Amino acid sequence: MAKIHTIVVGRLQTNCYILESNTAAIIIDPGDEPERIVRFVRDIKAKPIHIVATHTHFDHVLGVDTVRAMLNIPFLIHREDLPMLESMQSRVRQFMGFEVPPPPKVDGYLKDGDSLKVADETIHVLHTPGHSPGSVSLAGDGYVLTGDALFNQSIGRTDLPGGDLNTLIHSIRERLFKLDDDTTVYPGHGPETTIGDEKLANPFVGKAARLQIR
C-alpha cells in the first residue's frame, strides 16, 4: 500500500507529493523549496527513483534541478509539455512579472498507458491534457494525482498558452471520472477530494455543471 506525503511549496502553494512504497519513492511536482523536499525524503528514509512533473508550469518544476542534483534521479514529463518547459522563463516574465532560473533538462518522457513501478506499487500514467498539452495524472490503487487538471470543487485554468477548456473537460469526464467513485484525488493545489464527490458536485464538470463540451 502506497503512502502519499504532501509538502506544500512555493509562492503558489503547490502540492509536492512523495509517493512511497516499501521505502522506494517518486517525487511529484517539486515546484520549489528543493532542500526541504530532499530533507523530508531523507527523514523518512525513502529511496527515490524518479522525479515526475504532472505538467511543466513553473510552480511545479522550479525545484527539479536541485532535487535531481542532490538525489541523482531522472526527471520525467510528457513530451507534449516540452515546448512549454523550454519557454518557461519568457512565459513567467510575461504573465507573472518576475524572473525564474533556466528550465531543467528532461531525462525521459512519459506517455499515456505507461506504468511506473515503485517497489510493489504500479502507477498508471493517464494523459489528461487541457490545462496544458502534456498534463498527466498518475493513478494507483485507490488514488489519483491530478496535477492542475482537477481540484476540490474546481478545475485547472485554461486561459494560459496551451490550455483548452473543452479538452480539459473531456479529460476529466472521459478519463478521471471513469475511475472508481471512492478514488482519492490528490490535486496540484488545495485539499484532497474524491472522484465521486467531484462527479456529484463539481460546479464545472459535475452533474449540475454549467460547462458543456462543444
Question: What positions do the PLM features span?
Answer:
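Conserved beta-strand hairpin/beta-sheet module of binuclear metal-dependent hydrolase folds
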Residues: 2-44, 137-146
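Residue-level detector of beta-strand structural context in well-folded domains
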Residues: 5, 15-17, 108, 113-114, ...
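Short Gly/Pro-enriched turn/cap motifs at secondary-structure boundaries
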Residues: 7-8, 106-107, 127-129
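Conserved S/T- and glycine-rich ATP-binding loop of Class I adenylate-forming
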Residues: 19, 54, 128
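Metallo-beta-lactamase
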Residues: 25, 91-92, 115, 121-214
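Small/polar loops that bind or transfer phosphate-bearing groups
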Residues: 28-30, 53, 77, 120, ...
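Active-site HxH/HxHxD metal-binding segment of metal-dependent hydrolases
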Residues: 33-116, 200-210
